[in-house]
Amino acid sequence: MTKTIKYYFLLLIIFFITSCGTREFLGFEKKKIRLEGKRVSILNEDRIKESDLVKSSTNIILEKTTVLNNWPQSYNSPSHLSINHLSESKLDSFKFVVSGTGENKQSKILSQPVIDKNLLFFLDAKSNVISFDLKNNKILWKKNISLKSEKNHNIGGGIVVYKSTIIVNSAYGQIISLDKLSGKIIWKINVESSIRSAPTVFDNKLLSLTLSNKLYVLNGDNGNILWQHQGIFNNTTLIDSPKVAVDENIVIVPYSNGDFFALNLINGKEIWRNSFIDLGIKETTNAFSDIDAFPVIKKDIVIISSALGKLIAVNKKNGNKLWSRDITTTQTPLVNGNSIFLVNQNKEVICLNLLDGGRRWVLPIEKELSDNNKYIWLSPVLINSQLLLVGGLKKLISIDALSGVILRKKNLSNFPASSPLIVNKKIYLMLRNGDIIQIE
């Protein structure tokens, strides 16, 4: 009888020890209180339903096609406004141009190459800045900007052409000026944290946004700091990082905690502040509130999106909200004419009316093209009045911008690292394996 009692007593002890919450019961931990409110997914998984967007009755108007001779910075514009590129490409074949080091688990390519006077400059996955002569088909110089102690951790960074120099935002927390012809260092400054996006150039100023949500504005000639602006640090962030947008005398700064500011370009004085959290986008802030897509400015309208699941338009001068839509994208929207083209939830391409956010068309992307939506689609570009979309499972898609109908599908040799760039009617694309190809 005594043995039986001891046996049951032992089972009772084991039950208490192994039960969930025992550490709280015994006083080793404070009792966890379940927070009130509805539990929501960090990222909404639903596609846009037909009823979710008001249908626009206006027609799509695209700008006339234009030929660019240079591509000095990402999206070729400090405002990130897209043009309708004229190209001779038939989207039939691919020609190898040049190659750098490709990605691995600890090294990522996050920015576009740039082109100036037939010279192609790009940053590979090992932080090599490479200059390539497109006319003579040869590498002119290569400069490694990584730190000796951290050569295996190259996530992001970006480059821009500034006068006779190449400005590099380094993943190692440096902003570096290189001579465009030789690659020699002209000046460099240290900043407090890594930079994953390229600089924005405007009015002889360089604007670089760090991973710690600090904006540095430098004199492009000598690297002197003109002013700085600090946002709130966010320790839950996605891998990409946005660029600031500039138009006239206003700088639109997106921070990874969901805040975005309009600052005076001359002195950094705050003009207005807004936030996706303040706008009531979500009932919880315990999520990815990242703004990874670049803000886009057209006249007095700013288009900005968050991973929390909202696309909004605000007035550039006062920050007042013009409209908002339940759309989730980490890729920069394409704004041209009276329309916005973007990828929602990595599942569909949407065309919206710029003025009111009304839906013009929605194109679901076949799951097979991205292995059941596993692989990301990058920002579309507008070429010959067609949307060119790259990403998914090594795919290239051409879409009629007026109707949303797929015109062509092609397989790529590798995953794209950035959206295409178009110079002198030629289309170039950087791949994650370090190759740059021409789409012919």
Enumerate the language-model features and the residues they cover.
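A short helix->beta-strand "capping" segment at the edge of beta-propeller domains
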Residues: 42-58, 85-106
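Extracytoplasmic beta-rich repeat domains
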Residues: 90, 94-114, 142-160, 186-203, ...
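Loop/turn-rich, solvent-exposed surfaces of beta-rich toroidal or solenoidal domains
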Residues: 342-354, 358-399
